[in-house]
């Protein structure tokens, strides 16, 4: 890929997958899969467009919009829209590439894609966000559809933005269809969708705890990063299951519980209310049981923890922070964010897993541990196609089953293709990457995408 412009985030995601495949027996047993990897690494389609809109003062503003339709072998392209000033093609290609294999692990018929714009919703009025969403959908509507490409939300795109985008699509297309997921409950949304990524992450970790003979969440100290949708609902589910959440964070710093303290459900709800208004964690009011650490992530400040769940953004756990978690006695790290750990951090975790046997820290990659969000998006698509709405229990039960299947797929594939010593925990990063890749590669081969 040396003749291409530098795309560090995408190259990291590609490197993680390629490394997992190379360091297993897969290519020895199936050398033809090297061809599949070369083909799968190139998006089927990249759409880039300008978005022109007016701010509240009547001034013209322009942003870049994107949709990467990476792989449609398993179903319609599926993946979120991100509105954030950092958005560029490399980040969206990385997210879209990860999405292909994450969606494969859900067992649902969904391809992989990702999109967004370098628009910053922070500090914008409701009217400005509405006008931007309408302008963005003017172009995007030409490229999506319920059987073609079904976007969802991501950073900067919540229920309000999905509503504006869906309304604009409906006007342009003159039809109602399940073209977006994350919709409101009264107009085609699914119960459990807002909670799905956070809940699914916790369900996945429950299977890890059980397999590693580490009990349940009861009495466990859990470090979380982020304070958005994923972190909020993961925290609430952990507390419900008897665990203690001892940290949250945002782009300005980390909020860490003092000795003997942890977050309550009421405090999590208060933080959620702040985040809806795009307010920082610095505005959160408490009685002194938390320490605010400016400009920091929580990992080196949380003290002894059992479980760490990075749930903010990519590359939020460095090599040094990974070592700090090992030293703090953590025995599970599972990503709620996409590619939450740097490659060097993963090396630390994997080296510990190989060295310490059953007592090791066990790491789970986001494409497996956070696939609950897109899984329930897929369930929303299924409900839309039938014009029905399942109960909360029906959706939650299906989510638990999907997370179990994703865990088992990674576990069993690792046991099949990755050499391990007696008593060593299987490599979930290798197993999940290989399991997702095989499913996509076989579908592509059947459809003539490689031969």
From Swiss-Prot:
GO molecular function, one term: glutamate dehydrogenase (NADP+) activity
CDD domains with a match to the protein in the record: NAD_bind_2_Glu_DH (cd05313)
GO cellular component terms attached to this protein's record: cytosol
UniProt GO BP: glutamate biosynthetic process
SUPFAM superfamilies: Aminoacid dehydrogenase-like, N-terminal domain, NAD(P)-binding Rossmann-fold domains
Name of the top EC class for this enzyme: oxidoreductase
Enzyme Commission (EC) number: 1.4.1.4
Protein keywords: NADP, Oxidoreductase
Signal peptide: none
Catalytic activity, as annotated: L-glutamate + NADP(+) + H2O = 2-oxoglutarate + NH4(+) + NADPH + H(+)
Record: active site: 114
Stated family: Belongs to the Glu/Leu/Phe/Val dehydrogenases family.
Quaternary assembly: Homohexamer.
Protein name: NADP-specific glutamate dehydrogenase
Natural source organism: Fusarium fujikuroi (Bakanae and foot rot disease fungus)
Lineage: Eukaryota, Fungi, Dikarya, Ascomycota, Pezizomycotina
